[in-house]
Swiss-Prot record:
Gene Ontology molecular-function annotations: electron transporter, transferring electrons within cytochrome b6/f complex of photosystem II activity; metal ion binding; oxidoreductase activity
Gene that encodes it: petB
Residue ranges of the TM segments: 32-52, 90-110, 116-136, 190-210
Name recorded for this polypeptide: Cytochrome b6
Organism: Amphidinium operculatum
Miscellaneous comment text of the record: Heme 1 (or BH or b566) is high-potential and absorbs at about 566 nm, and heme 2 (or BL or b562) is low-potential and absorbs at about 562 nm.
Amino acid sequence: MGFIYDWCEERLELQSIADDILSKFVPSHVNIFYCFGGIVLTCFIIQAATGFAMTLYYRPNVVEALSSVTYITNEVSFGWLVRSIHRTSSGLMVLVLLLHVSRVYLTAGFKKPRELTWISGVILAICTVSFGVTGYSLPWDQVGYWACKIVTATPEALNNVFPSLGTVFVTLLVGGTSVGQPTXTRFYQAHTFILPLVTLALLLTHFLMIRKQGISGPL
């Protein structure tokens, strides 16, 4: 093990990176309310792990989606636990995210020079809500189906301001003239591929800016 560590250290300088991370100054005013962002990240990691586990059994089509979710819950070993953790941590993630945004806003953490940190955080919040919207419909039961109908019909309101623009958005979301298999495929791809990639990129940007600028001071 020592040989492997020395080999990696010579090429990557891991110790200097670790020293830089561990020696970062933490302001004295930081308290438990500054931990909400870390809790959101923890929830995201749990979501990713449990979500990946369920993709091994989930079938993203309108005929077998509900039966595959039922199979995960009732037949797969600890499947009920994995799904319960996924659902519970998703709700907790949204709740703690609201607390995190409130804390940053109330302590003026969005002001100069941290505007870009705030903007990336807002986009991350939008991604979080999008995770919820797309994931809610994946079981393709009655609740998921009608939730999907409501969500995909909402952009039609844009037609009142920009004629035909809302219709274009609806067509992109639905994948046709009505909610069906193309819709489920789009929601599944967004939930398991597009949104995770965008979120990871934004998280990296968010944390690098926090690392560079430090934690905002007290009011």
